C-alpha cells in the first residue's frame, strides 16, 4: 500500500491535486490518501500527559494515519510552505505522534524505516523543512525532498493550477520513480586564518550564503574543478599546494532551468592560503564574495549539513 498524507487545509489547492497525480503514478497499487482538510484534528493540550502513561485521551482518528504509514510500502508527505516552514497541520501531526508511539521503540523504529518522500509546494528551498522532516526518517538518512516552485512554471501559487502544467506533473513522476539527471560538482572550502571564503548567490530569487562550487567538466578531476570554480566565481587563486584534503560528499535535489529533476553530488575539498587575493564577483548570479569569520559563517548559514561539514573541515585544516 502507498500512503499519501496531504497536510494542506485547502480542498482544491496544489497539494490536493499533487496527491491525485501520486495516485495516478501508482495506479497499479493500492493508494490511501489522507487529506487534512477532510477532518478536524485536535492539537496537544488541556491534558495531564496521559499519552506518556497509558494512552492519549483524544480520539479524532489521527492514529489511523500513523497505523497506515507503518503498514505501508512507501509514504509520501505533501506539504505547503508557510513562511519557510511546514504548515501548522504538520506540527500538530508531530505532536500527536507521542500518543501513537507511546514510548514503543519498536513501533517507532518501524515507522522510521518506512520509505518516505516529501513534496513541498514552495517558492523557496528552505532548510527548515529538512530540519522538520528529519524526525520522520532514520538518523543516517537524508530526507528526499522535492520543492515545487509555482513561478518556475508560470503559475500563481494561490490558484491551485500547478498540476495543469505538463512539465510540473512530469517532474513529480520522475521524483516518485527516482529518475534523476545526475551531476557532480566540486566545492572549494578555502580557509584564510580563522576566515572562510564565501559567496552570496541568488537561489529562488533570494540571497543565499554559500561556498565556491561548480560542475566537474568531462575529464576533469575533482581537485582541478574546485580550483577552477574558485577562481571563476571569486577571482581567488588557489593551487594544489594549498590543498589539504577532502571530506564526505553530500547530495542535493533540485529542478534546473530546463525544468528537469537533478540529483547533484557535491565533493567538498579543503584549501588553506596564507595571503588572500583581490576578490571579485565574476558571475551574474553571485551577488557578493568575501572572507567571513568562521563563527559568523556558522551563525548565518541556514543549512545544518553545511555547518557540520565546515566543522569537520576545520578539524582537518590544522
Predicted regions and their residues:
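N-terminal beta1-alpha1-beta2 submodule of the flavodoxin-like/Rossmannoid cofactor-binding fold
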Residues: 1-102, 141-144, 162-175
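Short hydrophobic segments within beta-strands
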Residues: 5-7, 119-122, 199
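Short, well-ordered beta-strand core segments
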Residues: 74-75, 116-118
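Short, conserved loop/helix-junction motifs that constitute active-site signature segments
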Residues: 107-115, 137-140
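Glycine-rich phosphate/pyrophosphate-binding loop and the adjoining helix
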Residues: 128-179
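Charged phosphate-binding loop/patch that engages nucleotide di/tri-phosphates or the phosphate backbone
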Residues: 171-178, 299-318
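N-terminal strand-loop-strand
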Residues: 177-211
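Unchanged
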Residues: 216-240, 247-308
